[in-house]
């Protein structure tokens, strides 16, 4: 992860440790700042985001799909579709794919909402190494690399996966009776 860690989602804006906006969501579009790559001349990468929380779908199970906009993202060749979905009956364990990469996003405590992101084998079957931790903080979410050097989780994957967890773990829920 190239951005200065830890990152923090505050509402729909993700900022690095210096307070620089590195990603934001507006009207169903996730924008990842090109400067996150370390090159300030890089254009922003745009994703169309669809979730089960939008109300457009009738799915009782959580999912998030982030599809790169090929026509507006100059880096769209490198950007890949990302999907996050429930791995069981509850949102305790989420499975995710970003291109060919597979991840498990699991809560690290029974009653807590802190999560760890585990990079899985290519087929998604075996346990792998923890690459990041996500900790809810009020109405936001803190993202930190498990590896001090920050290697192991691409920045784009970290942004999309953490946004999915932000929706699940910090959004107020409407309980239907």
Where would I find each of the regions flagged by the language model?
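Low-complexity or membrane-interfacial segments used for flexible interactions
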Residues: 1-29, 33-35, 76-79, 90-177
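Short, well-structured hydrophobic secondary-structure segments
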Residues: 29-77
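Short, aromatic/His-centered strand-loop micro-motif at the edge of beta-sheets
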Residues: 82
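Surface-exposed, interaction-prone regions used to assemble/regulate multi-protein complexes
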Residues: 85-86
């Amino acid at each position: 992860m190239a951005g200065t860690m830890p990152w923090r989602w505050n509402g729909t804006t993700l900022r690095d440790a210096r307070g620089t906006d590195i990603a934001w969501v507006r009207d169903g579009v996730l924008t990842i700042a090109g400067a996150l790559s370390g090159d300030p001349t890089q254009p922003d990468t745009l994703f169309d985001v669809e979730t089960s929380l939008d109300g457009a779908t009738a799915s009782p199970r959580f999912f998030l799909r982030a599809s790169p906009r090929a026509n507006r993202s100059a880096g769209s060749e490198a950007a890949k579709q990302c999907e996050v979905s429930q791995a069981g009956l509850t949102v305790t364990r989420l499975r995710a794919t970003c291109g060919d990469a597979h991840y498990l996003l699991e809560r690290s405590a029974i009653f807590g909402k802190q999560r760890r992101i585990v990079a899985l084998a290519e087929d998604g079957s075996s346990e792998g190494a923890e690459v990041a931790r996500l900790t809810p903080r009020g109405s936001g979410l803190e993202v930190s690399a498990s590896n001090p050097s920050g290697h192991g989780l691409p920045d784009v994957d970290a942004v999309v996966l953490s946004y999915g967890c932000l929706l699940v773990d910090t959004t107020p829920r409407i309980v239907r009776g």
